[in-house]
Amino acid sequence: MTYEQLLQQATQKVVSYDKEESAAVLLLESVADLKANELYLKAKEKVKKEIVKEFNALLDRYLKQNEPVQYLIGKSCFYGYDFIVNPAVLIPRFETEELVENVLYRYDRHFKGQELDVLDLATGSGCIGITLALEEKNLHVTATDLSEDALEVARTNNKRLQAGVTFLQGDMLEPLKGKKFDIVVSNPPYIPLNEEVMPLVKDNEPHLALFGGEDGMKFYRIILSGIAPYLKEKAMICLEHGYDKKEEMIRLAKTYFPSAKVEVLKDLEKKDRMTFIYVGDFKWEN
């Protein structure tokens, strides 16, 4: 059997389960240790029996046991970098890439060329903090998480990608004593406890990283009510949140930072996905 035939057979099976066709490609690339272009270059080559066996076993786990592809192959692409992931950490989402992109854009706009201290709260796999450190060498990142298992994954990613991020274990603001930051960024758990969640997500990803209390706002209240002592005189707070939380985020931001400028940004699907809070002396163009 050739790679082309194996992939066609697998794609038909994936379609019959009403699942993502790209999953078959990702699984085969991983099992055969091939990069994206290499799979198509080898389309007419015969596949080794052991590769076929391993690939079909993983495909069955994806289709029949509903396991995420990213956990099966042990990695997820984020902002062009491969991050190791496992069930201890949330699988990085496209929306979070937009959060990183907006942080970098606003760094250039308000702090360009300056060396800054950045805090990544509830880091999970480390994808936010590590990417910021890799994309902008002037950003010195500290990342925290409650889960030691998650931090083990994040430290592994940090070492592989040589990002130079510092990691602290503790509950939200707990490990920050004596530290101050220019930028605080976080994608905390924000799904309300009673909200219906896709089985693929609910049955596989860590609930600690998914659910944000009864209304999904628990961790935003913790962050915004307690972060002030850890901010420098001029600081930017950058938060990803549920698309329906715009008014609540503005109200919360203004409660704890009444003189700050608050900016709510939309994601690529035109949903209100990020809130940026500017504390201190920021210059704005008319």
Give residue ranges: language-model regions.
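Generic hydrophobic alpha-helical segments
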Residues: A10, L99-V103, Y107, M172, ...
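Residue-level signal for pocket-adjacent positions within structured domains
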Residues: L34, K42, E67-P68, I73, ...
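S-adenosylmethionine
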Residues: L139-H140, T144-E285
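Short, Lys/Arg-enriched, disordered terminal segments
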Residues: M1-S16, Y107-E115, K177-G178, K261-E263, ...
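SAM-dependent Rossmann-like transferase core, predominantly class I methyltransferases
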Residues: N56-E136, V141, L146-T156, F276
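Short helix-terminating capping/connector loops at secondary-structure junctions
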Residues: E20-E21, F111-E115, K232-E233
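N-terminal auxiliary segments of SAM/dcSAM-dependent transferases
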Residues: M1-I73
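An acidic site on a long C-lobe helix of protein kinase domains
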Residues: I51, P92-E95, F219
